[in-house]
Amino acid sequence: MTTPTQKLSDAGVSIWLDDLSRQRLTSGNLQKLIDTENVVGVTTNPTIFAAALADGESYREQVAELAAADTSVDDAVFRITTDDVRDACDLFAPIAEATQGVDGRVSIEVDPRLAQDADATSAMAQKLSQTIDRPNALIKIPATEKGLPSIAATVAEGISVNVTLIFSLERYRGVINAYMEGLERALENGKDLSTIHSVASFFVSRVDTEIDKRLDAVGSSEATALKGKAGLANARLAYQVYEQSLDTERWKRLAAAGANPQRPLWASTGVKDPSLPDTLYVTELVAPNTVNTMPEKTLDATFDHAEVTGDTVTGTYEQSAEVLDAIAEQGVSYQEVVAQLETEGLQKFDASWEELLSTVRAALDAAR
């Protein structure tokens, strides 16, 4: 029998796990998910690493070595996280080779405290890439307005990028433009475009959570009927933007030079509203050449009972635009929501980074 995760894979969706820890690597758990649930990549973020480090057992030996060498907290965090990502890259190397670098990818985020400093973000992206030193690493850069030049600069150096925290269609267009600009500069720099890969991480459930809260405040029957629809509509329209970008002369010139398209990646796919199906943001966002990164709970639910019926995105654009228009008619501002979500997203990563630093600081102090 074909499993739901295999059906997703057959439909052109790459399944990535939105989690990483040393325990997951050393126990064989990640390899098991690769073997049984069609996992072909991993995404990480500061929140994930903060949770991993909170379970200190797997890191005790390395923390003791770092403490003995009088390593600073920032350097210790850098060493620990890049070591985990390098090991994960090695685990996924066969998949990366089999897919010519499309999958088998492991993402690591630049220090979120640098999100509003383009030059510092670009420098950190280069440092991460050089330190991990694996062709299947993806460097995550937030899609803030100030992050866009960093994306172009990083791609221009031949570094593969995961652009994260995308909430709005307008910002997504800016991300696509930054990727193409980076590829054009990489070509001028004599880089081999076929070795550069990118995904654009478009967040889904957080859009529903915020818009649904505002629809509840409106309280009309029309508003209630629109709940749980904004995230999917927004993501589906993002896929239309992606398709349109591939139809431009600018992209066709780059593709002829060997460039890889920047695939849409659906992030924030864990369902927050218990009244909605737990695989909603998986089964309703099936489209060719996409990635869905899932927390393990969503991955397991998908493997267990998701009903995958093929492409659920292509051809939904008019209907999706009508959903967003109807939400606007209820007095809910799309621009306000996406701006708020970007700000909150950065704040969450900042808080997680501080938590990560605090955890490592305490571990270093205990080992000294």
Curated annotation (Swiss-Prot):
Primary location group: cytoplasm
Catalytic activity: D-sedoheptulose 7-phosphate + D-glyceraldehyde 3-phosphate = D-erythrose 4-phosphate + beta-D-fructose 6-phosphate
Root EC class: transferase
Keyword match Cytoplasm: yes
Pfam families linked to this entry: TAL_FSA
GO cellular component assignments: cytoplasm
Any single GO BP term: carbohydrate metabolic process
Keyword check for Cell cycle: no
PROSITE patterns named in the record: TRANSALDOLASE_1
Pathway: Carbohydrate degradation; pentose phosphate pathway; D-glyceraldehyde 3-phosphate and beta-D-fructose 6-phosphate from D-ribose 5-phosphate and D-xylulose 5-phosphate (non-oxidative stage): step 2/3
InterPro entries in the record: Aldolase_TIM (IPR013785), TAL/FSA (IPR001585), Transaldolase_2 (IPR004732), Transaldolase_AS (IPR018225)
Superkingdom: Bacteria
Molecular-function GO terms, alphabetical: transaldolase activity
EC code: 2.2.1.2
Subcellular localization, as worded in the UniProt entry: Cytoplasm
Active site: K140
Key words, A-Z: Cytoplasm, Pentose shunt, Schiff base, Transferase
Function in brief: Transaldolase is important for the balance of metabolites in the pentose-phosphate pathway.
Family membership noted in the UniProt record: Belongs to the transaldolase family. Type 2 subfamily.
Protein name (Swiss-Prot/TrEMBL): Transaldolase
Gene source species: Kocuria rhizophila (strain ATCC 9341 / DSM 348 / NBRC 103217 / DC2201)
